[in-house]
A protein has these predicted regions:
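Short beta-strand and strand-turn-strand segments in soluble, beta-rich domains
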Residues: 142-145
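Short, exposed beta-strand/loop patches in secreted or surface proteins that constitute
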Residues: 59-66, 123-127, 189-191
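Beta-strand-rich interaction surfaces with strong enrichment in secreted/lumenal proteins
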Residues: 87-89, 149-153, 187-188
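Extracellular glycan-recognition modules
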Residues: 27-31, 40-44, 52, 77-138, ...
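Flexible glycan-contacting loops in extracellular carbohydrate-active proteins
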Residues: 68, 184-211
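Extracytoplasmic low-complexity segments
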Residues: 2-5, 15-78, 183, 228-258
Length: 258
C-alpha cells in the first residue's frame, strides 16, 4: 500500500510539473488565441486571457469546417469578409512577434497579406504571388522596406500552416510553411506599435478567399519546435484540457488505483 501511495504521489507531482507543457499554447507570451470551436454567433472568443475577442465583418463570413474542428469561411473581395479585433495594449508589440495560423486557400490573394494585419505595424499571411509575407514597421525600417516573402508557393485547395516570427534582439525575421523554415532576412529594429485595429482575413485592400483555423499571436519570436508542436497537435491538443480539469481527472484516477 505504501508503495502505491508513494508512486501516486510521485506521479501526481510529475503531472503537476508538466502542466506547463500542456499549457504552452497559452502562456504569458500569448496575446491572442483562437480555436474557432464555438461555431455560433458573431464573436470569436479569445482564449489567451487578454480579452482580444474578434467580431464578424463583411456580408458572408460564416462558421464552417476547419482543419481540426470548426473554422471560418471567408468569401473574398466581393463580400469583404474579415474579423475585426479592437486595439488593445496587449497587441502593441515591441520585442518580438509570432503569428501562426491554418489557411485553406480557394485562390491566391489579389494583393498583400490576407492572414493577420495590424496595418503599418505588423502582418503575416498569404499574398498575391501565392506566398507568405511578413511585413513590419520598426524604428530602423519603414513599412515598405521591412518585408520578407517565403520561398515556396502556398498550394490552393488544401490546408496549410503558416507562421512568421520576428526577434528584435537579433533583428531576424523568419517565415514557415507547414512547420519548416521557408525564408529569413535581417530587418533590424524595434517594432513600432499603433492603435489601429487588428484584422484577420484581410489586408489594406484584399480579402481572404478560403478558410482559416487556429490562430495564435505571441509577443516573442517562438522557436521552430514550438511552431511545429502547435501545428502537429493543434491548440486543443497542446492544451489537452484545462489544468484544473486535468488535475481533477488525474487525481481521481490515482485514487481509484490506490
Amino acid at each position: 500500500m505504501n508503495y502505491f501511495r508513494g508512486l501516486n504521489t510521485v506521479t501526481l507531482a510529475f503531472f503537476i510539473s508538466g502542466l506547463s507543457v500542456f499549457c504552452s499554447a497559452q502562456d504569458d507570451h500569448t496575446i491572442l488565441l483562437y480555436t474557432f470551436a464555438t461555431g455560433t454567433g458573431k464573436v470569436v472568443k479569445d482564449l489567451s486571457g487578454k480579452g482580444n475577442n474578434g467580431k464578424f465583418a463583411g456580408e458572408k463570413l460564416s462558421w464552417g469546417k476547419g482543419k481540426f474542428d470548426g473554422g471560418l469561411v471567408f468569401g473574398g473581395n466581393g463580400p469583404r469578409d474579415h474579423i475585426v479585433v479592437p486595439d488593445s495594449e496587449s497587441l502593441w508589440l515591441k520585442d518580438g512577434l509570432t503569428v501562426e495560423m491554418w489557411v485553406y486557400l480557394n485562390f491566391w490573394s489579389t494583393a498583400g497579406g490576407t492572414g493577420e494585419t495590424k496595418e503599418k505595424s505588423y502582418k503575416v499571411g498569404p499574398q498575391s504571388a501565392g506566398r507568405t509575407v511578413l511585413r513590419l514597421t520598426t524604428d530602423e525600417k519603414d513599412w515598405g522596406n521591412a518585408a520578407l516573402t517565403s520561398n515556396t508557393d502556398i498550394p490552393t485547395k488544401s490546408w496549410h500552416h503558416l507562421a512568421g516570427t520576428y526577434d528584435t534582439k537579433s533583428g531576424q525575421a523568419k517565415v514557415y510553411l507547414d512547420g519548416k523554415l521557408d525564408g529569413k532576412i535581417k530587418i533590424g529594429g524595434t517594432i513600432i506599435s499603433n492603435n489601429d485595429m487588428l484584422w484577420l482575413g484581410r489586408g489594406q485592400g484584399p480579402f481572404l478567399d478560403g478558410r482559416m483555423d487556429e490562430v495564435r499571436i505571441s509577443n516573442i519570436a517562438r522557436t521552430e519546435d514550438e511552431i511545429r508542436t502547435l501545428m502537429d497537435q493543434g491548440i486543443e491538443g497542446v492544451l489537452a484540457v484545462s489544468p484544473k480539469r486535468k488535475l481533477t481527472s488525474t487525481w481521481g484516477y490515482l485514487k481509484v488505483r490506490r
